[in-house]
Amino acid sequence: MHIDIMHYLIVSALMFTIGIAGIFLNRKNVIIILMSIELILLSVNLNFVAFSAFLHDLVGQVFALFILTVAAAEAAIGLAILVVFFRNRGSIAVEDVNVMKG
């Protein structure tokens, strides 16, 4: 069996759909929302790598590496903010985020 680009696109679309569903179905837990955003970014990366391999061009793979770097920084900053928020409030529920003073 030959794995074609359509297989990669189907898997990527499923990952993207699961990520969107994770955001919309679970609005109470911030960690699951962050994980869903990471899943969406990974599905976009899979698209870049699939098209890069299909077109024999390395630009998509380089762009995917940049996206992974930004996603790792975003996850680290998001988790650091959650740790500080949990220390101050004792909860990481989304309902408690909108009562922040700034």
UniProtKB/Swiss-Prot annotation:
The chain crosses the membrane at residues 5-25, 31-51, 66-86. One of its GO terms (molecular function) is quinone binding. One of its GO terms (cellular component) is NADH dehydrogenase complex. It is a multi-pass membrane protein. InterPro entries: NADH_UbQ_OxRdtase_chain4L/K, NUOK/Mnh_C1-like. Keywords: Cell inner membrane, Cell membrane, Membrane, NAD, Quinone, Translocase, Transmembrane, Transmembrane helix, Transport, Ubiquinone. Its EC number is 7.1.1.-. The keyword Transmembrane applies. GO terms for biological process: ATP synthesis coupled electron transport. It catalyses: a quinone + NADH + 5 H(+)(in) = a quinol + NAD(+) + 4 H(+)(out). It is found in: Cell inner membrane. NDH-1 is composed of 14 different subunits. Subunits NuoA, H, J, K, L, M, N constitute the membrane sector of the complex. Belongs to the complex I subunit 4L family. NDH-1 shuttles electrons from NADH, via FMN and iron-sulfur (Fe-S) centers, to quinones in the respiratory chain. The immediate electron acceptor for the enzyme in this species is believed to be ubiquinone. Couples the redox reaction to proton translocation (for every two electrons transferred, four hydrogen ions are translocated across the cytoplasmic membrane), and thus conserves the redox energy in a proton gradient. This is NADH-quinone oxidoreductase subunit K. The lineage of its organism: Bacteria, Pseudomonadati, Pseudomonadota, Alphaproteobacteria, Hyphomicrobiales.
